[in-house]
Regions:
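Hydrophobic transmembrane alpha-helices and immediately adjacent juxtamembrane helices
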Residues: 2-299
Length: 299
């Protein structure tokens, strides 16, 4: 009986297959194939997880509408122009992107370190830029769904009227604003990792000031030129101002600067933040190799 089992196993598993030196090696991706594979693999959990847990329909859509409703009723109480209602709805939708960058991108490497995954990322042949890009694309997909839900519901509830002047410019503004914003998130993710436990406090500290200086609920033109110019380092500031100029009739009269200039600034911010994120990642990896640990507190 045992001889029959042995001969059967020999027929199913050849000795050559058990030897690591024999036969063809398992093909492994490298270069751009590995880069794309890493991006897809890292974005997959965020995209699929969005469909498996539908509780976000309540927590990430209906609850943010409450703050939108507050500003809408304030504007209606003071008899503000109707376009201000649309400003609030669009701004409330864009908050979702800032929250995703703040908590889903900037703090992500710190949480990966706490869970023990960061060392695996660094030891793997995959590029850290590809890992962060995958997180950004996955987060962008899920956040876009939430923002669309807020815009649709807010527009229906408050009868917001849109007058798009240029779809091409609107797409360019949104695309460049997202590239710059998530580039900022990729850059600050390395910074947060170096700061270690202070990352949580920085995220809490950065949340409300950006609400103010990005002009989520009002035109930033009211700040005056110099404050608006300094606030423009935040990609959402320029992105929101340009989108409002393109989708509302009174937008151009309430805009900070012209849309073509804002598009140029967003393109420049995209390059700066993406390049800075690459430098920060290179420094983080060098620190890990030199000191034998992923991060340390700088005091």
């Amino acid at each position: 009986m045992s001889n029959n089992l042995y001969s059967t196993s020999q027929m199913l598993i050849q000795p050559d297959e058990l030897s690591p030196m024999a036969g063809d090696r398992i093909p492994k991706n490298s270069g751009w194939r590995l880069y794309i594979q890493t991006v897809i693999a890292r974005s997959y959990p965020r995209i699929v997880g969005q469909m498996r847990d539908l509780s976000w329909l309540f927590f990430d859509t209906l609850l943010p509408l409450l703050s939108v409703c507050t500003y809408v009723f304030v504007y209606r109480a003071i008899h503000a122009p109707e376009d201000y209602i649309g400003f609030v709805v669009v701004g409330g939708a864009m908050i979702a992107f800032w929250m995703n960058v703040l908590w889903g991108m900037s703090s992500q490497l710190y949480w990966e370190k706490e869970q023990g995954n960061l060392s695996l990322y660094i030891m793997s042949p995959a590029s850290m830029m590809a890992i962060l890009l995958g997180m950004a694309l996955g987060g962008l997909f899920s956040t876009t769904l939430r923002a669309l839900m807020i815009i649709i519901l807010g527009s229906l509830f408050f009868n917001v009227q849109y007058a798009v002047s240029s779809y091409a410019q609107l797409f360019a503004v949104f695309f460049l604003a997202m590239v710059a914003l998530y580039g900022l998130g990729m850059m600050t993710s390395s910074l947060y990792l170096l700061l270690s436990r202070e990352a949580w406090h920085i995220s809490n500290l950065a949340q409300e000031p950006v609400y103010l200086f990005s002009g989520f609920y009002f035109p930033i033109k009211n700040f005056g030129f110099w404050i608006s110019a300094v606030a423009s380092i935040i990609p959402l500031t320029m992105g929101l101002d340009a989108m409002r100029q393109l989708v509302f009739k009174s937008g151009p009269s309430l805009g900070f600067i012209s849309v073509p200039i804002e598009i140029s600034v967003l393109a420049l911010l995209s390059v700066i933040f993406l390049y800075s994120s690459r430098l920060m990642l290179a420094y983080m990896e060098k620190l890990a190799l030199r000191e034998g640990r992923l991060t340390e507190n700088r005091r």
